[in-house]
Amino acid sequence: MYNYFYQGHLVRKCLGQHFLHDQNIIESIVAVIHPLPSQALVEIGPGLGALTKYVAKYVKTITVIELDHNLVAYLANHPILQHKLNILSQDVMKVNFSDLAKKLSQPLRIFGNLPYNISIALMFNLFRHIHMIRDMHFMLQKEVVSRLLAKPNNKNYGKLSVIAQHYCQIDLVLDVPPESFRPVPQVDSAVVRLVPYVIPPYPVKDINKLYLLTSLAFQQRRKTIRNSLRNLFSVEQLLTQGIISTLRAENLSVEQYCCLASTLAECLPKK
């Protein structure tokens, strides 16, 4: 075990810190985000400001969310950024993004190099505030991006795929090799764009039922739907939805999960 310093900062592995340093990648990400002066830009995990500095050229203010107090102090005293940043020094998992959007008087444009150790949990949290988000651009582990984009009948297809694709149009923007970071991670990364649907292609009457269904179905993904959802649907009820009960969780489409969730919402009281 040894300490790793980057630009004088002690990297905290417990926070999943990997700092982007590749100039070409940074400029490509900013071009994709295409920030405009009047927009509410929010960066998660700004780190040492590698991406922040370039986005700041186009906007008056950026809200940044950073847990590491050493990095907060660095950003607060940054010669270029200090007058442009609204710094939230807190755990991003505890941020109420709906309240933040109301405070900024418009939907949020959220971006960042997400910490590997909380990226999936954070996205599920963000989906709960989706009505207050304009778009999201995230650097993620390539494996997580594969899960976001996965289609049925694929081993990467799961709860994250269904929930994310219900809420958003998702596009792979850029592949990012490990050597673009310091310290160098042991995984490949990619930048993904998520744009919330104004009207979801597959509406759901109660989103909590979709969360429940996908949790049960993918908890033991090798089980048949008949077994994993046996406490919610009979074989006959599944057939009325056009679903063969011997299929497995990964065989059902996003549309089918959404239809099942709406059917369930009609049968079970909303909680």
Curated annotation (Swiss-Prot):
Instruction: Specify which residues bind S-adenosyl-L-methionine according to the UniProt entry for this protein.
Output: 18, 20, 45, 66, 91, 113
PROSITE patterns documented for this protein = RRNA_A_DIMETH, SAM_RNA_A_N6_MT
Q: What EC number(s) does the entry state?
A: 2.1.1.182
User: Where is this protein localized, as stated in its record?
Assistant: Cytoplasm
Keywords of the record: Cytoplasm, Methyltransferase, RNA-binding, rRNA processing, S-adenosyl-L-methionine, Transferase
Q: Which GO terms describe its molecular function?
A: 16S rRNA (adenine(1518)-N(6)/adenine(1519)-N(6))-dimethyltransferase activity; RNA binding
Which InterPro entries does the record match to this protein? KsgA/Erm, rRNA_Ade_diMease-like_C, rRNA_Ade_Mease_Trfase_CS, rRNA_Ade_methylase_Trfase_N, rRNA_adenine_dimethylase, SAM-dependent_MTases_sf
This protein's GO cellular component annotations are:
cytosol
* Primary localisation category: cytoplasm
Catalyses: adenosine(1518)/adenosine(1519) in 16S rRNA + 4 S-adenosyl-L-methionine = N(6)-dimethyladenosine(1518)/N(6)-dimethyladenosine(1519) in 16S rRNA + 4 S-adenosyl-L-homocysteine + 4 H(+)
Entry function: Specifically dimethylates two adjacent adenosines (A1518 and A1519) in the loop of a conserved hairpin near the 3'-end of 16S rRNA in the 30S particle. May play a critical role in biogenesis of 30S subunits.
Which family is annotated? Belongs to the class I-like SAM-binding methyltransferase superfamily. rRNA adenine N(6)-methyltransferase family. RsmA subfamily.
Q: What is this protein called?
A: Ribosomal RNA small subunit methyltransferase A
* Source organism: Baumannia cicadellinicola subsp. Homalodisca coagulata
